[in-house]
Curated annotation (Swiss-Prot):
This is Phosphate acyltransferase. It catalyses: a fatty acyl-[ACP] + phosphate = an acyl phosphate + holo-[ACP]. GO terms for biological process: fatty acid biosynthetic process; phospholipid biosynthetic process. Homodimer. Probably interacts with PlsY. The gene is plsX. One of its GO terms (cellular component) is cytoplasm.
């Protein structure tokens, strides 16, 4: 009989190898290399494939548990998708993604992390890795803080501006697999973002998505609790909130802007006078805790779900601390076999649904 504790210990001790696009993002190696070094120090069981121009990676030469992979080109943050796909075939972004594509059944890395151009990353990842069976379009998923001192997983966050009801169902399945794998929740709750809780509200697409999600819940494939509203992302009513990429991206950027504004307001008020500065000293422990809870850098690292390989997107403007969080998320996903879990859950769910619930449409996803 297998010992679950021994199995868990063995899984934790297994080596996880990540491929890192060191040239991506607004800051490139000046951010990615320090983040990689901090990540390695915190994860003795991890190895990194650092991808980029040799001269840029020179400071990492000789690092333990690191392999340098040469790439002669860089995808700029404003490069069109077609440039990344057709012209820059030796870009650090593409080479890093290629490390997670199996060759003779074995991949060089278990997950890829990049802070590069979102549209290019999604398009190249889809071209190189392809989508899983039963998935029309990949989705971007990340976590947002909630008032329960936890977080809510939200998807899609910008990969697909226009979605069908079937796409939203697939997002729910993939999001459930993500939360189950990384957070250990066997049956995470799912809500469908809408303008009200009632099933009669919303567009025809949302209504149809609700029907599909309820059917999946009736078959025991999902824990769908119904429609949720925007504020429910932050109340923690559900573990997962599903929406199209346009709405999700707006919600994400709004939340980041609000957190920044609140921090600015608090700073202004506590520096307004000598009395307020004195009050700030007294409240300093509380303020630090508040800042830590709303710091969007802690939640950096969005998963590109639905591909035949694990790819994580860091914010393009991330600093070293934020990029390290993206590495942490990729590490946890790889260690907990996220890819296998997504595949298994998709297969089980689609078998219980009508055959028209998602034939691949072959379209390249849009990027917000």
């Amino acid at each position: 009989m297998n010992d679950p504790l021994a199995s868990a210990a063995e899984a934790r001790s297994a080596t996880v190898r990540l491929a890192v696009d060191c040239m991506g993002g607004d800051h490139g190696p000046s951010v990615t290399l320090p983040a990689c070094r901090a990540f390695l120090a915190a994860h003795p069981g991890a190895e990194l494939l650092l991808v980029g121009r040799p001269e840029a990676l020179a400071p990492a030469a000789g690092w333990e548990r690191c392999t340098l992979v040469s790439a002669s080109e860089v995808v700029a943050m404003d490069d069109p998708v077609e440039v990344a796909l057709r012209r820059k075939r030796d870009s650090s972004l593409r080479v890093a993604i290629s490390q997670v594509k199996p060759v003779d059944g074995v991949a060089a890395a278990q997950a890829c992390v990049s802070a590069g151009n979102t549209g290019a990353l999604m398009a190249v990842a889809r071209y190189v890795l392809k989508t899983l069976d039963g998935i029309d379009r990949p989705a971007i998923a990340t976590v947002m803080p909630n008032q329960l001192d936890g977080h809510t997983t939200v998807l899609d966050l910008g990969a697909n501006v226009d979605c069908t009801a079937e796409h939203l169902l697939q997002f729910a399945v993939m999001g459930s697999a993500l939360v189950a794998a990384v957070e250990g929740k066997a049956n995470p709750s799912v809500g469908l973002l809408n303008i009200g809780e009632e099933a009669i509200k919303g567009s025809e697409t949302i209504k149809r998505a609700g029907e599909l999600l309820r059917a999946a819940a009736a078959g025991g494939q999902l824990n769908f609790v119904g429609n949720v509203e925007g504020n429910d992302i932050f109340t923690g009513r559900t573990d997962i909130v599903v929406c199209d990429g346009f709405v999700g991206n707006v919600a994400l950027k709004t939340a980041e802007g609000l957190a920044s504004m609140l921090s600015s307001f608090i700073r202004q008020e506590f520096t307004r006078s000598w009395y307020s500065k004195l009050a700030a000293l007294v409240a300093l422990p509380v303020l630090r805790h508040f800042k830590n809870r709303v710091d969007h850098r802690r939640y950096n690292g969005a998963a590109l779900l639905g591909l035949r390989g694990l790819v994580f997107k860091s914010h393009g403007s991330a600093d070293a601390f934020a990029f390290e969080q993206a590495l942490n998320r990729a590490y946890d996903a790889a260690r907990n076999r996220l890819l296998d879990r997504v595949h298994d859950r998709i297969s089980a769910t689609l078998q219980a649904l009508p055959a028209d619930a998602g034939a691949p449409d072959g379209q390249v996803p849009e990027a917000a």
